[in-house]
């Protein structure tokens, strides 16, 4: 089974915060996360923020949700995650009770960031409720693009 087929086989739905936290090993606890949530513009905001942090010399992880292969959506210092590291992460997750797909992908990204020694990681949140599972998330950027802005301003 390939990495992508493993994640594609996972169910939709919601994971408990405790279930996700149980799958985050010690190295993940050292990473500070910045979540990006909202209706539109998440990918651009997350990529810009990660590039800015990396340009300042900070070892930075980036995860964005989407339909590309997961190995392309998890990045460390601007480069796609090492396939070997992602494979080890997928093996560890497959040994546990299955998480829903969005939660499993975010957990895999967090594990990769911890193992790669990232100081900061910018994560696009497919579900803002997943933010509570990640350790050290002092800030969450929220994007809102569209007619909603006219209502509030």
Predicted regions and their residues:
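Short functional linear segments
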Residues: 1-38, 45, 51, 55-56, ...
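Compositionally biased, intrinsically disordered low-complexity regions enriched in proline and serine
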Residues: 7, 152-153
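ATP-dependent carboxylate-amine ligase catalytic core
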Residues: 21-29, 52-140, 144-152
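Ser/Thr-glycine-rich phosphate-binding loops at phosphate-binding pockets of nucleotides
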Residues: 36-39, 43-45, 137, 143-146
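Short alpha-helical patches at coil-to-helix transitions and adjacent helical residues
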Residues: 42, 46, 103-106
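Conserved strand-to-helix beginnings and helix N-cap segments that scaffold or border functional pockets
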Residues: 46-47, 153
């Amino acid at each position: 089974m390939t990495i992508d087929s493993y994640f594609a086989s996972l169910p939709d739905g919601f994971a408990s915060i405790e279930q996700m936290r149980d799958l985050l090993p010690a190295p993940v606890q050292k990473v500070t996360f910045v979540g990006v949530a909202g209706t539109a513009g998440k990918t651009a905001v997350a990529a810009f923020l990660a590039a800015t942090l990396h340009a300042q010399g900070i070892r930075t992880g980036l995860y964005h949700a989407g339909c590309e292969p997961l190995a392309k959506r998890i990045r460390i210092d601007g480069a796609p995650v090492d396939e070997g590291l992602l494979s080890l992460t997928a093996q560890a997750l497959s040994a546990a009770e299955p998480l829903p797909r969005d939660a499993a992908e975010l957990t895999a990204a967090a594990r990769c960031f911890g193992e790669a020694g990232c100081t900061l990681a910018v994560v696009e949140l497919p579900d803002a409720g997943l933010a509570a599972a990640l350790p050290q998330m002092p800030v969450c950027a929220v994007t809102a693009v569209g007619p909603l802005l006219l209502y509030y301003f």
